[in-house]
Regions:
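Interdomain "pre-motor" coupling segment immediately N-terminal to P-loop NTPase/helicase cores
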Residues: 1-10
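Conserved RecA-like P-loop NTPase ATPase core
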Residues: 27, 35, 64, 95, ...
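AAA+/P-loop NTPase substrate/partner-engagement loops
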Residues: 73-101
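Hydrophobic positions in the central parallel beta-sheet of the AAA+
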Residues: 81, 117-120
Length: 255
C-alpha cells in the first residue's frame, strides 16, 4: 500500500531548521550541522530512498527533541516507537504481522502524520527484530505478513544511549550498523549550555508558579551546572519552584 502524500524536505525547511534548532536543542551545534548534511539528499525530492540516521549519546541531550522538531517542520507529529518494549512474541506479531486485523507496525506506518520516524532505543530490541527493517532502510519498503508499505523520502532516526561507535557496532551488529547513512553523536552539555537551559526553563515556568526571585534564579543556574542533562535540569527547577510555592501556601515552617 502506497503512502499518502507527505511534505518533502525543502530548502525553506532546511533554512528554518538551521536558524531555529538552537532554540529547541541547546548545546548541540555540531549535531545540527550533521543532521542537515544527512537530510540534504532529500531536498526537493532528489532522493527517494529514506535517510536513516543513528543518534547516540546520553539520554536528555536532545535526540528525541531533534526528531520532534523535524516532524513539526514536516507538517505534523512524529511516528515514535519505543524499541526497548520489543522483547517477546506479542512484539513479533506487531513487527512481522500477526492476524490481519491485529495492531501492527505496518498499520502504524500507513497511519503516520509525517515522513519523520523515530525508533527510540533501537539497540534495546531483540536483535531478531532488526532484520525486519533491512528493506525499509535500504529501499523504503516495509513488508510484513499482511502489508507492503512504501515509505519514500522519509527521515528515519534511531537513538541509542551508547557512548562510542565501537559499543554500537558490537551490540547492534554490522548488518544493521552498515545501513545507517549517518551516525551522529550528541555531546555532553557544557556548563554554559546547562545555564542556558536553566535560564529558558525558569522563564517558561516562573509565571505559572508566580515566582520572581533573582537570587533564587541565580542559585538554580549554579545548581544546573552540576546536573547531567536537560531532563535533570528541568526536574531541578520544577522541584525547586514547587517547594517555594508550597512554602508560600503552607507557611515557611510547614514544608
Amino acid at each position: 500500500e502506497t503512502q499518502q502524500p507527505y511534505l518533502e524536505v525543502s530548502k525553506e525547511m532546511i533554512q528554518t531548521f538551521n536558524r531555529q534548532y538552537s532554540e529547541r536543542v541547546i548545546g548541540q551545534e555540531k549535531s545540527k550541522k550533521k543532521l542537515l548534511q544527512a537530510i540534504y539528499p532529500l531536498v526537493d525530492g532528489k532522493q527517494s530512498k529514506p535517510v536513516v540516521i543513528l543518534l547516540y549519546g546520553d539520554s536528555g541531550l536532545g535526540k528525541t527533541e531533534s526528531a520532534q522538531y523535524m516532524a513539526e517542520l514536516m507538517g505534523g507529529k512524529l511516528l515514535r516507537k519505543q524499541f526497548s518494549m520489543y522483547q517477546n512474541n506479542e512484539s513479533a506479531n506487531y513487527i512481522f504481522g500477526g492476524r490481519y486485523n491485529e495492531k501492527s507496525f505496518a498499520q502504524d506506518l500507513l497511519a503516520r502524520e509525517t515522513n519523520v520516524l523515530l525508533f527510540d532505543e533501537f539497540d534495546k530490541a531483540l536483535s531478531i527484530f532488526h532484520s525486519a527493517f533491512y528493506q525499509l532502510f535500504d529501499e523504503g519498503i516495509y513488508e510484513d505478513h499482511n502489508y507492503k508499505v512504501v515509505v519514500n523520502k522519509a527521515i528515519i532516526m534511531c537513538t541509542s544511549n551508547y557512548k562510542t561507535i565501537d559499543e554500537i557496532k558490537e551490540h547492534l551488529g554490522l548488518p544493521i550498523y552498515n545501513r545507517f547513512d549517518s551516525i551522529i553523536k550528541f555531546n555532553d552539555l557544557s556548563g554554559i549550555a546547562k545555564e542556558k537551559i536553566a535560564e529558558r526553563e525558569i522563564e517558561r515556568l516562573k509565571e505559572d508558579y508566580d515566582i520572581e526571585d533573582r537570587e533564587l534564579f541565580d542559585k538554580i543556574k549554579k545548581g544546573a551546572v552540576t546536573q547531567s542533562n536537560a531532563r535533570e535540569i528541568k526536574h531541578l527547577i520544577k522541584d525547586t519552584f514547587s517547594l517555594v510555592a508550597l512554602k508560600k501556601i503552607c507557611g515557611e515552617t510547614e514544608v
